[in-house]
Amino acid sequence: MWLPLLLGALLWAVLWLLRDRQSLPASNAFVFITGCDSGFGRLLALQLDQRGFRVLASCLTPSGAEDLQRVASSRLHTTLLDITDPQSVQQAAKWVEMHVKEAGLFGLVNNAGVAGIIGPTPWLTRDDFQRVLNVNTMGPIGVTLALLPLLQQARGRVINITSVLGRLAANGGGYCVSKFGLEAFSDSLRRDVAHFGIRVSIVEPGFFRTPVTNLESLEKTLQACWARLPPATQAHYGGAFLTKYLKMQQRIMNLICDPDLTKVSRCLEHALTARHPRTRYSPGWDAKLLWLPASYLPASLVDAVLTWVLPKPAQAVY
């Protein structure tokens, strides 16, 4: 009885692997990538440039654009883009249209993102959440909507970089909220544009060493957040809480942050070049073995584990 089931599962796995490895012919199609100053965006831009794609890379800063242009081929073009500014997005869309012309846009990679303040929710303000949502959620939505006509023209692909923290909210702050929102947008977009030949993939990296996970930056923002708290709130948590929280954060980041960014860029490249791109990619050992399995566990169990890991406030009653 079990043998036919086992053979059937094995056959399915082999067929899936064969299908997953089918690639499109070599292409010089246009791909637009946001957030190419550093990290995943910069690495992907250079990889695609080497493969012959015509890369249109957007950077937030002039120095980021200049550094990228210096090491890339003449096929790669850069522009400045602030994805939180609707006028900047429209200007970038016109710039892309000027380059692609009748060919259309084959690929859009929404990569730009920020961490914001990672810390206890009661420490934060509405503006703290809004700033992160503007970059990580509303930014990609605005860029995607502005470029949809060009993507439809080429029957192109949208790749949105979210996070495993868009599947499991492991900490407070706007980051998890923003990534959950981008996941939902991507799922609904995928179904809505499939009729027009546009494919949508989500890449959910685990923890990697990028500017978003820079410990010095994360610690500075949380210390500034603590300093602005009312004395009563500081008393609830106690002076030792911040020190314990930062030490815990440092231990976790040093343990699980992967320095190999190519694990992510390879997934992004596959989503652009595979004949049958996956709906979701989860690069990183921690994503596959820790965060995604945990997202399917009962919420009460996940709550218990995370509550045990995080330090307790001085005046905790539970």
Curated annotation (Swiss-Prot):
This protein's UniProt keywords: Disease variant, Endoplasmic reticulum, Glycoprotein, Lipid metabolism, Membrane, NAD, Oxidoreductase, Sensory transduction, Steroid metabolism, Transmembrane, Transmembrane helix, Vision
Record annotation: effect of changing G35S: In FALBI; decreased stability
Function recorded in the entry: Catalyzes the oxidation of cis-isomers of retinol, including 11-cis-, 9-cis-, and 13-cis-retinol in an NAD-dependent manner. Has no activity towards all-trans retinal. Plays a significant role in 11-cis retinol oxidation in the retinal pigment epithelium cells (RPE). Also recognizes steroids (androsterone, androstanediol) as its substrates.
Listed name of the protein: Retinol dehydrogenase 5
Tagged with keyword Transmembrane: yes
Cytoplasmic side: 310-318
Mutation effect (S73F): In FALBI; decreased stability; loss of 11-cis retinol dehydrogenase activity; accumulates in the perinuclear region
Reactions the enzyme catalyzes: 11-cis-retinol + NAD(+) = 11-cis-retinal + NADH + H(+); 9-cis-retinol + NAD(+) = 9-cis-retinal + NADH + H(+); 13-cis-retinol + NAD(+) = 13-cis-retinal + NADH + H(+); androsterone + NAD(+) = 5alpha-androstan-3,17-dione + NADH + H(+)
UniProt note: pH dependence: Optimum pH is 7.5-8.0 for 9-cis retinol dehydrogenase activity.
Disease annotated for this entry: Fundus albipunctatus: A form of fleck retina disease characterized by discrete uniform white dots over the entire fundus with greatest density in the mid-periphery and no macular involvement. Night blindness occurs. Inheritance can be autosomal dominant or autosomal recessive.
Membrane topology type: Multi-pass membrane protein
Tissue: Widely expressed. In the eye, abundant in the retinal pigment epithelium.
Cited PANTHER family: RETINOL DEHYDROGENASE 5, SHORT-CHAIN DEHYDROGENASE/REDUCTASE FAMILY 9C
GO terms for MF: 11-cis-retinol dehydrogenase; all-trans-retinol dehydrogenase (NAD+) activity; androstan-3-alpha,17-beta-diol dehydrogenase (NAD+) activity; androsterone dehydrogenase [NAD(P)+] activity; protein homodimerization activity
Family: Belongs to the short-chain dehydrogenases/reductases (SDR) family.
Pathway: Cofactor metabolism; retinol metabolism
Segments on the Lumenal side according to the record's topology features: 22-288
EC code(s) of this entry: 1.1.1.209, 1.1.1.315, 1.1.1.53
Amino-acid positions noted as binding NADP(+) in the UniProt annotation, renumbered to this chain: 32-56
Origin organism lineage: Eukaryota, Metazoa, Chordata, Craniata, Vertebrata
Chain sites annotated for binding substrate: S163
Cellular compartments annotated: Endoplasmic reticulum membrane
Location (main, coarse): endoplasmic reticulum
GO biological process: retinoid metabolic process; retinol metabolic process; steroid metabolic process; visual perception
One GO CC annotation: endoplasmic reticulum lumen
InterPro entries per the UniProt record, alphabetical: NAD(P)-bd_dom_sf, SDR_fam
Sugar attachment sites: N160
